[in-house]
């Protein structure tokens, strides 16, 4: 199944209050790191500013410290020498998750990007793992691969995404499920941890589906991507496989602007305690 979700209402890149951009930047931040850790580490960095008496200077320095921390310690880099594909790809994973959550009722996205050893490294793990339980007789597990292209078109993109999804199926790797459980219990997310324990221990039945998201710059998209995938021999292991195409105008600018706003969420966490 192929669904074409073309952005009909583009966010305003110049509006600091744009809800679409601010929502994406928030989820980019929490997708890369634990909110409580981020907040506490920023508070530690800001302690030396308590003696400053000039509010304008203090506010400027606080903003600079938070921005530097988020950009250097949490988010991937888009500077020369680093993998730009990580910068672009991580955005795609977050956008795809939000589409599933907002439009289809999935919950609790597990992003592989949070568990990389380094922020600019790739990790061998399914891009997306989300759960849907409401209104279903059995839980539905969605595994997804996301391919994001913000520049030229690669007509083999769909085939590459399909092959990645076949390779990185978490349900076929008990160590990955155990890893999920360990992380969730350590974070005191007991409900979610118990759910994955039931999967790992084969206590509950569940349905599963596989999604391939192709997030692409609208101006360079070619239907050849889907034509090539349609003529490709698909793996029988991908149960309920579907493709979702998301075409976005000025995708690279949207990505960069979303990252640049991520620090604002930290500022709000600190002010609200």
Task: Give residue ranges: language-model regions.
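Non-catalytic C-terminal interaction segments of nucleic acid-processing enzymes
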Residues: 209-273
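Short, solvent-exposed loop/turn segments that connect beta-strands within catalytic domains
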Residues: 134-140
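Conserved catalytic cores of phosphodiester-cleaving nucleases, focusing on short active-site segments
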Residues: 100, 128-130, 142-148
């Amino acid at each position: 199944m192929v669904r074409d979700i073309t952005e009909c209402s583009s966010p305003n890149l110049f509006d600091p209050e744009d809800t679409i951009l601010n929502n994406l930047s928030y989820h980019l931040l929490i997708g890369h790191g634990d909110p409580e850790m981020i907040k506490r580490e920023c508070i530690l960095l800001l302690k030396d500013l308590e003696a400053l008496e000039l509010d304008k200077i203090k506010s400027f320095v606080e903003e600079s410290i938070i921005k530097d921390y988020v950009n250097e310690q949490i988010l991937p880099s888009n500077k020369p020498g680093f993998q730009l594909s990580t910068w672009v790809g991580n955005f795609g994973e977050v956008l795809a998750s939000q589409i599933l959550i907002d439009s289809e009722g999935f919950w609790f996205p597990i992003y592989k990007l949070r568990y990389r050893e380094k922020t600019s490294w790739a990790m061998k793990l399914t891009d997306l793992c989300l759960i849907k339980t409401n209104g279903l007789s059995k839980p539905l597990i969605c595994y997804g691969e996301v391919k994001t292209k913000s520049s030229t078109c690669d007509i083999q993109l769909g085939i590459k995404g399909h092959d990645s999804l076949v390779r990185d199926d978490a349900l076929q790797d008990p160590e990955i499920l155990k890893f999920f459980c360990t992380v969730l219990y350590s974070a005191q997310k007991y409900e979610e941890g118990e759910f994955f324990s039931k999967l790992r221990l084969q206590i509950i039945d569940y349905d599963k589906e596989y999604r391939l998201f192709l997030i692409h710059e609208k101006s360079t998209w070619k239907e050849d991507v889907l034509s090539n995938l349609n003529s490709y021999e698909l793996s029988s292991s991908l149960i309920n496989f579907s493709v979702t195409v998301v075409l976005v105008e000025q995708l690279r600018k949207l990505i960069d602007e979303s990252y640049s706003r991520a620090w604002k969420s930290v500022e709000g966490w600190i002010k609200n305690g």
